[in-house]
Amino acid sequence: MMSAPYASASGPAAATAFLTGAAGALPSRTVAVLEAIKRAILAGELKPGQALVEADLAEVLGVSKTPVREALKTLAGAGLVSMSPYKGAAVRVVDHEQARNLYDARLLIEPEALARAVAAGHDWRPAHQALQRADQAADQAERSLANRDFHRELYAGCGNPLLIHMLDDLRDQTALVSAAASCSQGGVRA
């Protein structure tokens, strides 16, 4: 069911279960498509610079082009996808300066959010569970996703939804840098 350029490491059955909501409440199609594409980008399954063809993604994910188009727009707004007139969408290619700027911003903001979460008495059990998932991960993609969850849990209790949203975007963009760095094609450019 999944074609080669968009194949998921977790396979067609997992993608189908995710899209149909078999594992829980039925998410909107756009949210499901958004999460599936984001996961593939951050896991390095979709490489930096790789074209994201709406029709192909729609076929692979078993949806119409509309939720794919909306998901790509949202991912472009989050800095994971670049949109070009007449060329369409592609996985964003990050240069070294952008990578440094992303990590710099995250290093400035995340410690403050963590300090606020500590002051608020945040429940650290989900962070601990994410660390355990990272330790037990079967592959690098699974470990990376658990690590992202761990970092999110560190700042999730800061009490400021805007700060959480900003850090979520920075976290995703730095994960893109990590995925790009691990690609043999060299998705981080000088």
Walk through the language-model features, giving the residues of each.
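Short linear motifs at protein or domain termini
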Residues: 1-119
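Amphipathic, non-membrane alpha-helical segments in soluble helical-bundle scaffolds
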Residues: 69, 96-103, 124, 160, ...
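Flexible, glycine- and charge-enriched loops at secondary-structure boundaries
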Residues: 30, 140, 188
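C-terminal all-alpha effector/ligand-binding and dimerization domain
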Residues: 2-14, 25, 129-133, 179-190
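Conserved amphipathic alpha-helical segments that form helical-bundle/coiled-coil interaction surfaces
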Residues: 119-184
